């Protein structure tokens, strides 16, 4: 009798998991039909110009590097090293957290207004997350893949606040995180529909570890560093119903090879959706 009860329980859990996974797949259907995530919003720099150009080229998924300004507003900047000389902090002011992401004390940073008035290389206009939200209201078909460079809880609370908890905006936010526990933090803030986990060299984990996290947290997208893009790893992900985006890829012939082993899409600086042939 005990064995029968245990067996029934296991079957129920399996059915529940499959229902949840199918639900997540349906929710993410708007995302997975696209092959390209624009790295740094497109063009190698988190800028207004890169964002607009990538959209014009058919790209609809955008990787947004989120940091805080001096006045506590979300701004987009991949690395502080990339904007040295434009603001008052120096290279010596940059320190690194436990996953090797550069940080600067907030008091040394520009305000949101100062940041957004800055043009990198006299051509790229810096943007805030508020700017992105306004564009999301106009472009109803875009999704923002959020890369929280600072505290996850503070970042996602600010995302929701900046979007005025508007479901039309927040339902097109892709929560993309490194740590399993961070998904619990984010789920307590808002029931985001799209979840992705990152497998990069700065936090090494095996495919089995990633798969187990995906099962536990109901994640169905994996953002994989190219160092992990071997046939066995990708096969394991696909066999478990996961959608795989490789990062960062700027060689379209390499992407073709990745697609042959099951990779669904890539994070890229200079490859756009209009360059991709349907497969």
Model segments located where?
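Phosphate-group recognition and catalysis centered on beta-loop-alpha active-site segments
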Residues: 1-279
């Amino acid at each position: 009798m005990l064995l029968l009860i245990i067996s029934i329980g296991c079957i129920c859990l399996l059915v529940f998991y499959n229902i949840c996974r199918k639900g997540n797949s349906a929710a993410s259907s708007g995302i997975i039909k696209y092959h390209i995530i624009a790295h740094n919003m497109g063009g190698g720099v988190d800028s207004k110009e890169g964002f607009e150009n990538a959209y014009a080229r058919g790209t609809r998924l955008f990787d947004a590097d989120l940091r805080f300004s001096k006045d506590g507003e979300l701004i987009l900047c991949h690395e502080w090293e990339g904007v040295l000389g434009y603001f008052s902090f120096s290279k010596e002011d940059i320190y690194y957290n436990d996953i090797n992401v550069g940080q600067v004390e907030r008091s040394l940073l520009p305000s949101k207004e100062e940041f957004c008035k800055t043009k990198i290389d006299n051509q790229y206009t810096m943007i805030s997350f508020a700017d992105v939200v306004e564009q999301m209201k106009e472009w109803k078909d875009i999704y923002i893949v959020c890369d929280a460079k600072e505290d996850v809880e503070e970042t996602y609370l600010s995302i929701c606040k900046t979007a005025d908890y508007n479901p039309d905006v927040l339902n097109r936010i892709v929560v993309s995180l490194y740590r399993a526990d961070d998904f619990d933090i984010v789920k307590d803030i808002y029931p985001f529909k799209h979840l992705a986990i990152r497998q990069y060299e700065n936090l090494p984990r095996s495919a089995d570890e990633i798969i187990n996290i995906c099962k536990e947290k109901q994640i169905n997208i994996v953002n994989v560093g190219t160092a992990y893009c071997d046939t066995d790893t990708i096969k394991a992900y696909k066999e478990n119903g996961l959608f795989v985006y490789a990062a960062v890829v700027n060689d379209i012939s390499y992407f073709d090879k990745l697609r042959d082993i099951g990779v669904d899409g890539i994070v890229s600086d200079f490859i756009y959706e209009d360059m991709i042939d349907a497969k």
